[in-house]
Amino acid sequence: MQKFDIKGTKTEKNLQEAFAGESMARNKYTYYASKAKKEGYEQIAAQFLETANNEKEHAKIWFKLLHDSDIPDTATNLLDAAEGENYEWTDMYDRMAKEAREEGFDRIAYLFEAVGKIEKEHEERYRKLLANVEGGLGCSKDGDMIWQCANCGHIHVGKQAPGMCPVCEHPQAYFQLLAQNY
């Protein structure tokens, strides 16, 4: 994709608006699909989901143009995500809860506060993952751990995930710690 110098232009603002609009439409259509499915309209649900996927791809076009035609590396994305979550719980939801409470909407204020606490957990998760990526610890831990290939389900026990899955040959990055607390 061609690169453009759009910083500070109306086109940059339009790309941001297009990205936001397509992103919101995608979520809305997935909610509509769930409702249609609950009401027994399988074909309509499928159409909503197909359109939601189209909207996701449209949003990706605008996102890439906003980021010099490329999605940044994982460390950059983790930092961006952590900072976004930080803003949500320290500023956005705190402010929104206060305003809702001032207007007499105590239940909505509670929900803003409760979601804000979840966003704090999200920030902490992203910062831990970033530290793992920066420290090369994503696929290596102290002591034996149970690793599972996210692609085929192969289980490996060791301090480090294998460099490549011996079953499906996916790279080490596909291994994750096996979740066993159901």
Regions found by a protein language model. Give the residues of each.
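Non-heme di-metal
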Residues: 1-182
